[in-house]
Every structure is written in C-alpha cells, then in structure tokens.
From Swiss-Prot:
The twin Cx9C motifs are involved in the recognition by the mitochondrial disulfide relay system. It comes from the Eukaryota. Residues 9-51 form the CHCH domain. PROSITE patterns: CHCH. It comes from Clavispora lusitaniae (strain ATCC 42720) (Yeast). This is Cx9C motif-containing protein 4, mitochondrial. Belongs to the CMC4 family. The keyword Transmembrane does not apply.
Length: 87
C-alpha cells in the first residue's frame, strides 16, 4: 500500500486523493476503484488504532461507520456500479 505522491501528508489524505484520481480516470465507476477504497479504509483503521475512536480526520469516515464499511466489504462485493442508460 504505497502512498500517492500528489497529496499532503494529512491523515489518510493521499489515499482519499487516490480515490478521487481513480474515479476521474474511470468515469466515476466506483467498482473500478475497489483497491483505492480498500487502501483508504486500511489507513483509516490504522489511524483510529493509533489515535482512538474519538479521533477525527476529514478523509476518514467516523469510527463506527468505518467499522460498518469494513464489515460490509468483508462480506462481499459492495461497490457501486454504473448502470448504462438507455438512449
């Protein structure tokens, strides 16, 4: 899990920036950015382990929401997918 170089070193900000970059590169198709999302959640998990559940980072979900997201991801595919509109 290497850090993207284009962002500041705020708590997990490089990983949040990597998600933004991935979404832009993939036409906002979240399902193509699973690895970037997982990397952010791993960073946020470490952030809370080091700073406690009451810590805050603008780049991380609140502690309880992060726990829910990690549980959901462990249960299977949960990324949003783009649905092609009919023309």
């Amino acid at each position: 899990m290497s850090k993207p170089e284009s962002c500041d070193e705020n708590a997990c900000k490089p990983f949040a920036c990597a998600i933004q970059d991935c979404l832009i590169e993939n036409g906002y198709n979240e399902s193509k950015c699973t690895k970037a999302i997982d990397n952010l959640y791993k960073c946020c998990k470490q952030f809370y382990e080091e700073n406690g559940p009451d810590a805050a980072s603008v780049c991380c979900p609140k502690f309880n929401l992060l726990q829910l997201k990690l549980k959901q991801r462990s249960l299977g595919k949960i990324d949003a997918e783009l649905i092609q509109s009919r023309k």
